[in-house]
Design a protein with these regions (language model features):
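Short glycine-/polar-rich loops that comprise or flank the Walker A/P-loop
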Residues: 14-16, 49-51, 298-302, 325-328, ...
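A glycine-rich (often HGG/GG-containing) alpha/beta subdomain
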Residues: 1-145, 149, 153, 329-330
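C-terminal-of-GTPase-core extension/linker across diverse P-loop GTPases
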Residues: 2-11, 141-263, 280-282, 294, ...
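Inter-motif core of Ras-like GTPase G domains
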Residues: 285-309
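Switch I (G2) and immediately adjacent beta-strands of P-loop GTPase domains
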Residues: 52-72, 252-280, 296-301, 305
């Protein structure tokens, strides 16, 4: 990492764009193309965290006016000397400034190379580097706060504490076995078991944070289901804020699964408006109904829409039991009309799907109650986005491997096997946790993380 890299660090088309340099010659390269209005402000002599206004030139050719900010190693994003040109945001202007700094001695940065350098220079951990991806992809307040929590080191600290406990247990076992003549405290199986159980509880919680984390980051896969003409499409259009589904009084109008991603409060829903669940002789509608059933099987959340202004139909009585044991909210629609569902019918529905709300999709009422009901059934009512949360498949794989090895160690200890055998399992668990943090991650694993980055990050 002795060379100096450069890249456009902002999306094109904005009013302001940035060209970023990082490396040992970043300030010198910047000085070759920058003409400050105040001649005393040379990039190489400016204090860190300061800026200067001037012109960017390629030889004698003026390219743009810009503000140059400088940061001195190790107090920068990458841990290296960094220079940032804030120019006008036109694509051609930025490309010309980038070409000028490359001609002056920098080389084009690779995808994710700035953050990779931050990792290699100890400015961030691997989990913190992964959080940068999540910040860029955040779709709502919760996902942004979760990503920022990871960037602040919430997951890294909790995983490292668990790994340290396991390493300490291994060291104690090794010292007691290998140096019996020394004054080493005897390993107490009950005390050791208590420590291991606490670590296992931590890993179990982290492993189960995966599903919540996915719902927060990627959105809740949601199927809107119900019989024909109960208001599913009206609800879809209300949630999406535009007409995505055809709304008529004719049953079977929606013949396929219509998908949309919407924000509902601080939640993101990946909605699927399904064809009405009913018997039909229309072969096209039959295909739509079959796709609806598949969407029902694969979703995280079911919004089951019923028409409160009429009694249950035989078809509804047939599919409602499928909600049992699922994360489902029963939506009694058309509350603006006289109710026709009986107390007995609502009681039978509550027996299979206890959470329900009454709304009028046509009038747009009841959304606040629906939002809270969704949080309740998917387990996000008390979700803390700043807590340690598993963010991706790599992290989940490490946690699962660690928990599996730890469970084997606990079972070996309880079964009275040798402490050597227990220690081997604990070492494997600790190794998996340290792989998660990046301390023992292979170059290939790190490469896969940075494959997800774009140039300039």
């Amino acid at each position: 990492m002795r060379d100096t890299i450069a890249a456009i660090a902002t999306a094109t088309g904005g009013g302001v764009g940035m060209v970023r340099l990082s490396g040992p010659q970043a300030l010198a390269v910047a000085g070759r193309v920058f003409r400050p209005m105040n001649p005393t402000k040379s990039p190489e002599t400016m204090p860190g965290y300061t800026g200067a206004f001037g012109r960017v030139c390629h030889g004698e050719q003026l390219l743009d006016e810009a503000v140059l900010f400088v940061y001195h190693a190790p107090h920068s994003y990458t841990g290296e000397d960094v220079a940032e040109f804030c120019c006008h945001g036109g694509e051609f202007v930025l490309s010309q400034v980038l070409a000028a700094v490359i001609a002056a001695g920098a080389r084009p940065a690779e995808a994710g190379e700035y953050t990779r350098r931050a990792l290699m220079n100890g400015r961030m951990t691997l989990t913190e580097a992964e959080s940068v991806i999540d910040i860029l992809a955040a779709q709502n307040t919760q996902s942004l706060r979760a990503a920022l929590g990871a960037m602040e080191g919430a997951l890294h600290r909790e995983v490292l504490a668990a790994a340290d406990t396991l390493t300490d247990c291994c060291a104690h076992i090794s010292a007691w076995i290998d140096y019996p003549e020394e004054d080493v405290e005897e390993v107490s199986p009950p005390v050791l078991l208590a420590r291991l159980n606490r670590v296992e509880a931590t890993l179990f919680r982290l492993e189960h944070s995966w599903q919540q984390g996915q719902m927060v980051r990627q959105g809740i896969a949601t199927a809107i289901i119900g019989s024909a003409n109960v208001g599913k499409s009206t609800l879809m259009n209300l949630l999406s804020g535009r007409e995505r589904s055809i709304v008529t009084d004719i049953p079977g109008t929606t013949r396929d699964v219509i998908e949309e991603t919407v924000r509902l409060g601080d939640l993101t829903l990946r909605l699927s408006d399904t064809a009405g669940l009913r018997q039909s002789d229309d072969p096209i509608e039959q295909i739509g109904v079959e796709r609806s059933r598949r969407a029902l099987e694969q979703c995280d959340l079911i919004l089951a829409v019923l028409d409160e202004s009429r009694p249950l139909t035989p078809e509804e009585r047939e599919w409602l039991p499928q909600l049992s044991g699922r994360a489902a909210v029963v939506i009694y629609n058309k509350q603006d009309l006289p109710p026709a569902l009986t107390a007995e019918e609502k009681s039978a529905i509550a027996a299979v799907a206890p959470v329900s709300v009454s709304i009028s999709a046509a009038a747009g009422t009841g959304l606040a109650e629906l939002t809270e009901a969704i949080r309740q059934v998917v387990g996000l009512s008390h979700f803390d986005p700043t807590a340690a949360i598993i963010a991706n498949a790599r992290q989940l794989e490490c946690i699962t491997a660690a928990r599996r090895s730890l469970r084997e160690g606990i079972e070996a200890l309880v079964a009275g096997e040798t402490l050597d055998a227990v220690s081997v399992c604990l070492e494997q668990a600790a190794d998996a946790l340290l792989t998660l943090t990046g301390r023992r991650a292979s170059a290939e694993a790190i490469d896969k993380v940075f494959e997800q980055f774009c140039v300039g990050k």
